[in-house]
Amino acid sequence: PYHPNPAIAERYDCKVAIDKLVWDFRVNGSELCKRQLLEIIEDVVLRDIMLRECTMRLNGLKVVYQFCMQEHIEDLRYITQVQADKLEKYADTAYAKELAERELRECQKYLFCHAKNILWDSTVWYLERLHLEQYRVNPSNPVKKFSFMGIEKRENREILQEYMKYCLGVTH
């Protein structure tokens, strides 16, 4: 397998089935979505994690990629619940479905938490990015995210997001 860093390429040499490492980014689909997934794939590959965990993550990401290309998903930040529910069709086993669903959530989290600016129009907000004061978080049952994926009508979702920003005390 090729990677610009030879040490990383060597890590995967002869240890993983090659089909798990081959990604065809020439497929028709959103360039933004492809770039988002490529950034996440690179992050996974560069992490110092066990090869088994890395392989599981790549397997899930591959199903997410195939799903996004076939469903013409433009941007992972705006996936709705109806779209996410379709993901199960793209996995051939219950295990692959579970991996893909987990990776879709991880993609959303990565994109929200690593963006230069907070992406207030995303369909999922992760509160770790908002750095709320300790007194505003219930330590026995902390809320980790707000999901707006179930709100299909864009205008309604935007109104609720503005209201949630108000509730959180965010004015920018």
Where do the language-model regions lie?
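Charge-rich, intrinsically disordered N-terminal extensions
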Residues: P1-H172
